[in-house]
Structures are given as structure tokens and as C-alpha cells.
């Protein structure tokens, strides 16, 4: 394809294919049809969704499942603006996502500002700039959100952004291309990354890391703990090895679930349970890998941190707003760092993380507040294969699953407590299920209502998606918030459709289940290549990871 006549849209698709992108998600519009016109077997397939927000959610879900770049394509003005909630979730959660949108045709624009071209606005990229990934090059900040004006600028921007998005810390980017430019023939050579970007990448590659301060602190410490966040998903086996070497319990953030799970020291309970927090407080030093230590993961920073903290992160500035670290190592080379730490003398076992996890889970399972939630968790653990994906929405059922499920590998669960985006679940599940791997969506009736149109996408694509739908009559978590705060229940009790009739109208299988039948139902669904909705209606009490319960003893 390099030597043939290609439009700008075709060249962009070829660059994405070269980057390993096999599927993108989008909606065609009058301005972005150039992408659909350029489709071919050698270029990424574009899966058509039913709402622009969904195309970014789907890309986000795919990126979380694979760790690779995922792409969304939308159209000018309202089409691009519709993606903002999903773009924010991807950006805040550190997903490797690129949104490409058409913009108003350049030939019709006025130099004085918007003049009323269909879908036109003054600066479309400005919608995304506050959320987009930033990199600092020679003390200047490059924001990965740009509106291009020419074919050469568009292609050069794609080349540069693909490079910048590929390095940690991961984030989301936006590129806008005028509609008439997308359809222009590209006659130039594909450029190399700009000198600025190459210098930036070279600096990262050749960075010098001084681990001596870390080594000194570790030499003085016997009880070592490890905290793994979403920025450490690529070093799961290395963290497990380090944990075994230091006999260090592994605490994980929501995004870090499954990291180091091969270690006997992996905790399968959240820090929000007293047993986990007490163990954390017993550590003399905590090694923090790739975590921002945000409010939801730390009960708004009220947990009992050890006295000594060491932070390893490609961008430690956010975490340093939340903690004071004794040593900060700004680097993405976590595997190399861990290999150096392994040269230190090992430590004797001082805590039984497996026993603590087992006993805590048993205690929660036997409690009035936790019995139903842990029954749900157990059903999924028993019946949903490790290699299959799970996507959770902001729902009580999702909170139990995303936090308490014994996660056996990184990226097994996509959980939207980055930005906390209700309605994430259904459109995000389109991403991993589009690869052909059976995917479980755990959601509530309130969240799924945000994207019911995507049931048409599920049906049309015949995605291997099981929608485990918990119907509690509306916004169950918000209802609980109102009850705890002694507020009247207003705006939370909602009318729902007949789920069976709804499923049938889309040609989707429907199963009316309950928690006792769920293991058998999910086991059958885990090997099915067709979509289904599985309904449960039992009452679920929110888990201790939810903020209204943080103050409980």
C-alpha cells in the first residue's frame, strides 16, 4: 500500500494497522466517511456502534483487556463532543486510547472563527486538551490533543502521537482532521517521528536511575510490603518474584488487581477491609509501583500507611499530591528496577497473606451485609474461566466483583473507578468481546440504561457477551447513599423495561436466574459464542470499598 494512491484517511488506517490495531470503533458521519471508503482487508475493521460515547468506551475496554493501543473514530462537532465522558474515563484511568475525528472542512472556514459550517466549532481539540496525555519535551509541554489543518500535518501528528502514546505513563490522545483533508490524496512520504519526539524517546531510553537510596532503606527494613497499581500491569511476574524474595505482602489498587497474583503473598482482599489495612500498617516500608494512590483506593488517604514509602512511577507527580515519599524513582523501567532489588538479601516470612485473605473472605461471606455479595463473587470465581474477560459497571454488583473477585492475572477485570463513570459497562464490554473471547459484563439496571442502544451492536456483531444484569429498581448505590445520609429517596427509584421482552426484541438470549443458580448458568455461558442477558434481582448490600462504609469498624 505504501506506493499506491491513498487518501489521508487511508494512510491513517495504514499507520494504525502497522501499530497493531486490528479493530477500531466508530460511527460514520458525512464528514468522516473517508475512513469507511478506505476500508480493506489490510486495514483495521471499524465496528459500528450506536452512540459516539460508546466508540471510546469500547476502545477503552479493548485497551484495558489487551494493554495495546485501541482506536475510536467519530465525526465533527456533536459527534466528537459526545465522546467526552468516555474520553475522560480512558484518560483518567490511563488507557492506551486514540480518538480520531473529522473536523469542519478547511476550505470553507473563516480565519476569524466559526461561521456556521455544519458541525463547526472554533477549536474542537480544546474539548479534549484538559484530559489528554501530556509529555514534557525540553521543558515544554506537548498536549496530545491537536486539530490539524493539512494532510502533511495530519500524518506527521499521527506518527508523533503513536510514539508518544506508546510510552508510560499511558493516556489518551485526540487528533482532529478536516473533512476535506481526509479525502485528499496523500502524495508525500510518510515522515519519521519529529526530532523533538525522537529526542524525548531517546532521553527516556538513556535515563540514569540511582537506586542507592532505595537499597539503603531496604537494607534497614525487615517487614517489606508492595503496593501495585495499574502502571505495573506489565511486570506482574516480576512483582510476584520480588514479593517471594522479600516475603512481602502484595496490596493492589483497583486497576492493579491480579498483579503479582502468582505469589503466595498476594492479598485477594481490598485495603478497605480491616485485616488488609492492619497488615499494611505493620509494614516497615512500602514499595509502590505505578499507582497514584487516589482517594477511592485509600479511603481518601485515611489508611494507615507505613512510615517509609518508596515510589516507582513514570509520572510520580500525581501520587506525590497524595503522599510524602522517602524516595521517588521517576522511571517506567520497572522490570529493570526489580531485577536490581532482587540482588538484595531475601527476607524471612513475617505474614501469611493467603491465610489473611481466606479468613477475611470467610468473615465477609458469613456476615449479613456481605453474604449475598460474596455469593455473587463466588459464583463468578467458580464458573468464569481465568482467560476470559470481565467488565464491571458502577453498580453494587460491579463493586463486589471488581474489588473482591480473586483476580488471577492483570487485565482480567475492567473496572471504571478511575473517573467513576456510570454507564461504562455495556459499551466498554464491546471492546474485549469483539476479539471473540467470551466476556462477562457485570452491571446494574441504572447503568445499562445509559447505553441500551448498544444491544443492537451486540446483536449485529453476535458478540460472545454475557450481560449479568442486577435489577434493584434503579440507582441502588445512590439509594443507599441517601439512606445513610438520612436523605429522602428521590430520583433513584426508576421504571425498567421487561428485560425478557427487550432481549427478545434484539434476538438475544434471556435467562432469569438467581444467586444459587448462577454458577451453573455462567459456566454454560462461558463457552457460548452468542450473546445473552442473565437477570438477577436479589438484594445486595454495598461492600466496604464503597465510601458510605469507609467509617465502619
What are these regions (language model features)?
Residues 122, 154-220, 347:
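Conformationally flexible catalytic loops at phosphate/diphosphate-handling active centers
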Residues 11-21, 61-67, 162-169, 210-224, ...:
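Glycine-rich phosphate/diphosphate-binding loops that line cofactor/substrate pockets in enzymes
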Residues 1-4, 135-152, 176, 189-190, ...:
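Phosphate/pyrophosphate-binding active-site segments
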Residues 64, 228-314, 318, 408-438, ...:
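Glycine-rich, anion-gripping cofactor-binding loops and their flanking helix/strand elements
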Residues 101-155, 254-354, 467, 482, ...:
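Glycine-rich, acidic loop regions that bind phosphate or pyrophosphate groups
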Residues 9-13, 17-20, 27-40, 355-436:
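Active-site diphosphate/adenylate-binding microenvironment
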Residues 30-106, 108-122, 280, 285-294, 320-322, 399-553:
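Thiamine diphosphate
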Amino acid at each position: 500500500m505504501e506506493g499506491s494512491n491513498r487518501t489521508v484517511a487511508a494512510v491513517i488506517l495504514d499507520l494504525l494497522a502497522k501499530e497493531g490495531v486490528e479493530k477500531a470503533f466508530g460511527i460514520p458521519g458525512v464528514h468522516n466517511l473517508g475512513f469507511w471508503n478506505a476500508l480493506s482487508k489490510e486495514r483495521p475493521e471499524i465496528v459500528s456502534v450506536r452512540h459516539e460515547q460508546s466508540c471510546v468506551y469500547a476502545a477503552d475496554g479493548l485497551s484495558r483487556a489487551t494493554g495495546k493501543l485501541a482506536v475510536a473514530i467519530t465525526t465533527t462537532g456533536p459527534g466528537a463532543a459526545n465522546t467526552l465522558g468516555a474520553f475522560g474515563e480512558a484518560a483518567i484511568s490511563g488507557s492506551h486510547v486514540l480518538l480520531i475525528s473529522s473536523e469542519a472542512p478547511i476550505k470553507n472556514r473563516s480565519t476569524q472563527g466559526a461561521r456556521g459550517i455544519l458541525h463547526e466549532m472554533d477549536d474542537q481539540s480544546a474539548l479534549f486538551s484538559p484530559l489528554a496525555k501530556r509529555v514534557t519535551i525540553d521543558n515544554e509541554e506537548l498536549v496530545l490533543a491537536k486539530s490539524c489543518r493539512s494532510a502533511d500535518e495530519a500524518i506527521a501528528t499521527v506518527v508523533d502521537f503513536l510514539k508518544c502514546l506508546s510510552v508510560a505513563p499511558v493516556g489518551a490522545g485526540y487528533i482532529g482532521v478536516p473533512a476535506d483533508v481526509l479525502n485528499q490524496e496523500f502524495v508525500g512520504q510518510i515522515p519519521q517521528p519529529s526530532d523533538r519526539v525522537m529526542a524525548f524517546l531517546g532521553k527516556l531510553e538513556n535515563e540514569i536511575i540511582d537506586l542507592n537510596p532505595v537499597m539503603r532503606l531496604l537494607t534497614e527494613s525487615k517487614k517489606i510490603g508492595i503496593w501495585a497499581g495499574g502502571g505495573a500491569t506489565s511486570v506482574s511476574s516480576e512483582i510476584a518474584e520480588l514479593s517471594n524474595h522479600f516475603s512481602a505482602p502484595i496490596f493492589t489498587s483497583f486497576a492493579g488487581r491480579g498483579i503479582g497474583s502468582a505469589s503466595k503473598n498476594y492479598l485477594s482482599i481490598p485495603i478497605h477491609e480491616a485485616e488488609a489495612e492492619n497488615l499494611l500498617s505493620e509494614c516497615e516500608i512500602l514499595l509502590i509501583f505505578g499507582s497514584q494512590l487516589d482517594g477511592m483506593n485509600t479511603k481518601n488517604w485515611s489508611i494507615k500507611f507505613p512510615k517509609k514509602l518508596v515510589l516507582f512511577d513514570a509520572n510520580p507527580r500525581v501520587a506525590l499530591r497524595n503522599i510524602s515519599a522517602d524516595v521517588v524513582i521517576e522511571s517506567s523501567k520497572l522490570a529493570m528496577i526489580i531485577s536490581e532489588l532482587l540482588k538484595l538479601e531475601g527476607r524471612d516470612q513475617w505474614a501469611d497473606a493467603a491465610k489473611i485473605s481466606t479468613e477475611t473472605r470467610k468473615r465477609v461471606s458469613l456476615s449479613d451485609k456481605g453474604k449475598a455479595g460474596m455469593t455473587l463473587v463466588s459464583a463468578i470465581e467458580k464458573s468464569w474461566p481465568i482467560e476470559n474477560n470481565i467488565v464491571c459497571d458502577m453498580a453494587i454488583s460491579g463493586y463486589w466483583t471488581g474489588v473482591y473477585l480473586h483476580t488471577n492475572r492483570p487485565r482480567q477485570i475492567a473496572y471504571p473507578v478511575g473517573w467513576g463513570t456510570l454507564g461504562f459497562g455495556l459499551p466498554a464490554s464491546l471492546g474485549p468481546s469483539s476479539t471473540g473471547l467470551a466476556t462477562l459484563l457485570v452491571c446494574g439496571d441504572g447503568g445499562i440504561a445509559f447505553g441500551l442502544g448498544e444491544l443492537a451492536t451486540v446483536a449485529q456483531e453476535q458478540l460472545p457477551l454475557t450481560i449479568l444484569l442486577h435489577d434493584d429498581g434503579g440507582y441502588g448505590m445512590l439509594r443507599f447513599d441517601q439512606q445513610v445520609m438520612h436523605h429522602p429517596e428521590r430520583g433513584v427509584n426508576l421504571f425498567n423495561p421487561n428485560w425478557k421482552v427487550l432481549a427478545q426484541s434484539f434476538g438475544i438470549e434471556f435467562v432469569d436466574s438467581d444467586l444459587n443458580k448462577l454458577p451453573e448458568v455462567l459456566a454454560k455461558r462461558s463457552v457460548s459464542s452468542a450473546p445473552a442477558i442473565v437477570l438477577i434481582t436479589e438484594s445486595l448490600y454495598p461492600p466496604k470499598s464503597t465510601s458510605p462504609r469507609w467509617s465502619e469498624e
